[in-house]
Amino acid sequence: MSGDPKIEATAVAKTKEDTNKVDIKAMRQFVEIKGGIENEIYNPENATTYFYREVRRSVPFIKVPEIIKPNGSVNFGGQCQFNIPRCGDYLLNLTLYIEIPKIELNITETAAVPGGAAASLHRVGWVKNLAHQLVKEIKLNIDDTTVVNIDTAFLDMWSEFMTDNGKFDGYKEMIGGSKELWDLDDKVAGAGTIILPLPLFFSRDSGLALPLSSLISSDISVEVLLRKWDEVLLLEDINNSKNKVIKADDIKDGEPKLTSIKLIGTYAVASKYEVNKTRCDDRRMLIEKPFKASEYELPVFDSGKLDEPIPINMEKINGAIKALFFAVKNTSRSNEHSVYKVGLPIPGTLRIDGGSLHALSEIGINLAEHVFVPSLPIEYYSYQQPYEHAKRIPNNRDLFMYSFCLDVGDVDPMGSINPKLLAKRLTFQIKPTKDLAEATKNKQTFKFITYALCNRLVSIRQGKFTLLSQSMYGEDGEDE
């Protein structure tokens, strides 16, 4: 075309001396050659150069940690409250540290083994992923409102789908996945420190950090409810390889006690300019709030089909649903709280009694009277959905998700569904496997659990933090 730039002959002509050199002048002219798409995406006006870095300026700030101790003494089975101090202008994250004591058995029964030696009949150890199973419930309270409420199963699901692959192995070590804690020993369950980063909304992005300098009239606290020691400790009888409930008399020093528990908060301290500006300004935040939407006890199956749809409780959900996390949880044992298989873990191993058996073969989702997701193989929810919309595909293939948004990891609005538009009717249609049907006949018990991850609007005004109600059209209603 006549309007296209021309490459001058002198620009590409080369002598014998420079045949191995790049002709910069010629290359620059090649860069200037543009077609339709280049004219669309490369525009000198308001364009960014990649070779002249513009600094995005910020007010000055510094990041500092602070140890937060609970009110009073705390032990297994107790509830501890942490009042969040104002050690900075913003709260970035909170991490729970729990020191676990050593457990030494008081049982002296032995049996002969090949070679003539005597071995203990019993072995003891902590459950795997101890932090998830020891922490029964976590609440973030601001004034009289519970802003976030999470439990063991949500911690299991969130970590599997939303922890970056590069951090996942380290995360498992932090929460008690190391063999030193869960490996069963003849006499001793090892001591150690378990570390649990709390997945609260303000840890998701620095732009959602909790603005303490603006919340001058609000009291902020975190409540942690712990399970009893005998709910997270395993005792195995070698004769029959069964997980037995341990008693205080079985332990040398009697009933065990926690060594210590604390939170470490990460704060940002900003300049006076920012503090003065944000303290005076009203603002709104779009936060994430998980809801426990169902805990449906599965019946004994006489066939491989569940005729009645599993309802999801939308009564307390007030917000736009980003994603659903769901699973069939095996509730057969009082001291195993993170089992999502048919069959039960063999203490001291990574194996499942009877093999790693799936509970479901297909899952469908209905919205109101309509099929929203047809009945699909479970791999759609454990592989394809997290591959497309989460940070990782879970190691545990019996944890499932369905995303209404494009990217669950992004805190910006990227799609959602309003449950009020559905007249609060959302159901799952599941197809149990034969293994699940047999297990229910053999007195294993299961629950279908669902969590809805929702967006909520928050108002920060006159020093107070308020969750806003939303109408079915997304307009702000009265404060809760």
From Swiss-Prot:
<comment type="function">
    <text>Major protein of the capsid.</text>
</comment>
<dbReference type="GO" id="GO:0005198">
    <property type="term" value="F:structural molecule activity"/>
</dbReference>
<dbReference type="InterPro" id="IPR016112">
    <property type="entry name" value="VP_dsDNA_II"/>
</dbReference>
<dbReference type="GO" id="GO:0019028">
    <property type="term" value="C:viral capsid"/>
</dbReference>
<protein>
    <recommendedName>
        <fullName>Major capsid protein</fullName>
    </recommendedName>
</protein>
<dbReference type="InterPro" id="IPR031654">
    <property type="entry name" value="Capsid_N"/>
</dbReference>
<keyword id="KW-0946">Virion</keyword>
<keyword id="KW-0167">Capsid protein</keyword>
<dbReference type="InterPro" id="IPR038519">
    <property type="entry name" value="MCP_C_sf"/>
</dbReference>
<dbReference type="Pfam" id="PF04451">
    <property type="entry name" value="Capsid_NCLDV"/>
</dbReference>
<dbReference type="Pfam" id="PF16903">
    <property type="entry name" value="Capsid_N"/>
</dbReference>
<dbReference type="InterPro" id="IPR007542">
    <property type="entry name" value="MCP_C"/>
</dbReference>
